[in-house]
Amino acid sequence: MSTKKFLLEEKDIPTAWYNIVADMKNKPLPILNPQTKQPLKEEDLYPLFSKGVSHQEMNTTDAWIEIPDEVRELYKVWRPTPLVRATGLEKALDTPAHIYFKNESVSPIGSHKLNSALAQAYYLSLIHI
């Protein structure tokens, strides 16, 4: 019988988020400020997001953004997420490829959304919100 579940160790939790825009040859057009119709500036996002999140959102040059240690420690509650081999799907597709999915049900809320929400809460805590 083949292994269906693959569990990574805590030491394998990522240390940086990947920002794909930094590696794109053809970068997306800038987001326009709805009032001025000019390209949005980082500061325009401050009423909605913390400075840390705003900076990441507007960052088009750094491919890797370090995950703060405090966030990585909290990720350990449910990460790394188990990888599960989808042998039934492989068989249904009649493919020699190995297909895997991340089992996000081990997260306290049963989805990946907490990964982003936790980081946003962390950056807001830095400005005492």
Predicted feature descriptions by range:
Residues 1-5:
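Extracytoplasmic/secretory-pathway segments with low complexity and glycosylation-like composition
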Residues 127-129:
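Conserved small/polar residues in nucleotide/adenosyl-binding loops
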